[in-house]
Amino acid sequence: AAALTACQGKAAEPDASAAVSEKTGTGASETKEKKQGEKESSGVFESFTAQDLDGNQVDETIFEDAELTMINVWGTFCTPCLEEMPDLAELNREYQEKGVQIIGICSDTINADKELDEAQLEKARELAEQTGADYPHIAMSGTLVDTLLPQVMAVPMTIFVDSEGTQVGTAYMGARDKEGWAGILDEVLASVQ
């Protein structure tokens, strides 16, 4: 499995102590206060290739039908990741009518040679099923190994992208409950509408 071993629990209450530049859905740059648990990330999803947990090819077209996609990077070893997955599944169903989809990316599906690990893929499939996380899940594979994985310092990490795969706002580190994510989803969705 991949060398990523850090796991973050529930995020603390937001702390608006530092300002960062934020990329919006229109590509404009504006200043927004950075909250605790947020991190900037580059636009690795505008052009990528990978496989889902069942071996099907996936690329940036996965974002086309949603106004906003919440990408949750998780690990099979990460208890906080697994604990928030049922809430994410509920949010995926509740926000579909608003043009939002949730996609998971399992961070530990490759071996030291950057090849897919079948045992880890099976474990990821089982955990997604056990947690009721019935939204799409992508394996850390293809171009994501070199573009996304180096940016993942801990899991869960959540990134929002628009229909073209352009990142919206900052990346969020750590798990949250359903209400916490709903508030963030509402705020980010408003910024792309």
Where are these regions (language model features)?
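Short pre-active-site segment immediately N-terminal to redox-active cysteine/selenocysteine motifs
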Residues: 67-69, 74-77, 109, 154
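Thiol-based oxidoreductase modules, predominantly thioredoxin-like and allied folds used
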Residues: 99-121, 133-142
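Thiol-/selenol-based redox modules, centered on thioredoxin-like
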Residues: 160-193
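C-terminal motif of bacterial Sec signal peptides marking the signal peptidase cleavage site
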Residues: 3-6
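A short beta-strand-turn-helix
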Residues: 47-69, 93-94
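Bacterial signal peptide processing site
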Residues: 8-11
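Short, internal strand/loop/helix patches
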Residues: 120-161
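Conserved redox-active cysteine motifs that mediate thiol-disulfide chemistry
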Residues: 73-90
